[in-house]
């Protein structure tokens, strides 16, 4: 049974608006940093840097800038998948999927004080992630998404079952927009993770403000 949306290391309120980056809408690294800053200024309390196509050296350089920006702004910095990069740049944590480095192994690399988020699509996966030491979960896909074509949507009942089963914060991810976010009301969520609903917008800061307010209205 869930508590009040907190873990030992992260408060659910920090997860109200979880920004996940995508280079598709940034011309270069400078533009990406500007977008991240705007998302934070609009209310994002945690940002995940996701890079699937950069080489190691370029990713490392970008991650250093990213972590420095998040520290300056006072928000949580998460690196997607790359545990070695997260450790090297001193990020606040890492997010891993079911097919990425297991949460237990990530904990071994990062130590006890860093945040580890895990993607889950079922109660079984959620409970396994919690048992392995996850600090929060990203569940979905909540809706059909163009960001990850292979991410099949899960039902609202499944989301509710996950949030009821675990004691750590949970955010929904996948196809979430200002038009459908309220459909997640009553699911026991601590927040939403968004990609295109934020970074594909012309005014990222305004989009963040709107999404934060909507997320606040449906949280838990």
Residue ranges and their predicted role:
Residues 48, 148, 170, 192-193:
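A generic, residue-level signal for flexible/boundary positions that often mark functional hotspots
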Residues 139, 171-176, 192-196:
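Glycine-rich beta-strand-to-loop/alpha-helix junction loops that act as flexible
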